[in-house]
């Protein structure tokens, strides 16, 4: 008896960045070590991102991943916290809906 091929899963609900919470989409460019990454944000800035412990324990973040970041109140053009990482299915949904624009090319 053969297994049926699984259909690709469509995301039922995708978390989008909330402007009232100052959230921005970003792409991880480089892993720096010690829970730090370099993130190219959709607002044009390249920031050093910090991966908080609660996120670091649950998921792995790699170069090229699409994430939601929150800039710090101090040094907002240079530093940020990563609060969410998208899966491949969610990234395709975001690109179809126009959230990623030209920065994901």
From Swiss-Prot:
Keywords of the record: Initiation factor, Protein biosynthesis
GO molecular function, one term: translation initiation factor activity
InterPro entries linked: NA-bd_OB-fold, RNA-binding_domain_S1_IF1, TIF_eIF-1A, TIF_eIF-1A_CS
Residue stretches making up the S1-like domain: 12-87
Pfam families associated with the record: eIF-1a
Alphabetized PROSITE patterns for the sequence: IF1A, S1_IF1_TYPE
Functional note: Seems to be required for maximal rate of protein biosynthesis. Enhances ribosome dissociation into subunits and stabilizes the binding of the initiator Met-tRNA(I) to 40 S ribosomal subunits.
PANTHER family (UniProt xref): EIF-1A
Similarity field: Belongs to the eIF-1A family.
Protein name: Translation initiation factor 1A
Name of the gene this protein is made from: eIF1A
């Amino acid at each position: 008896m053969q297994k049926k091929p699984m259909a690709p899963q469509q995301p039922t609900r995708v978390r989008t960045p909330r402007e009232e919470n100052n959230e921005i989409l970003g792409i991880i460019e480089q892993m720096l070590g010690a829970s730090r990454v370099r993130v190219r944000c959709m607002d044009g800035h390249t920031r050093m991102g910090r991966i908080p412990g609660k996120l670091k324990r649950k998921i792995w973040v790699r170069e090229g991943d699409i994430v939601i970041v929150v800039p710090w109140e101090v040094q907002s053009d240079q530093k940020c916290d990563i609060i969410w990482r998208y899966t491949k299915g969610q990234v395709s949904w975001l690109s179809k809906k126009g959230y990623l624009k030209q920065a994901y090319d």
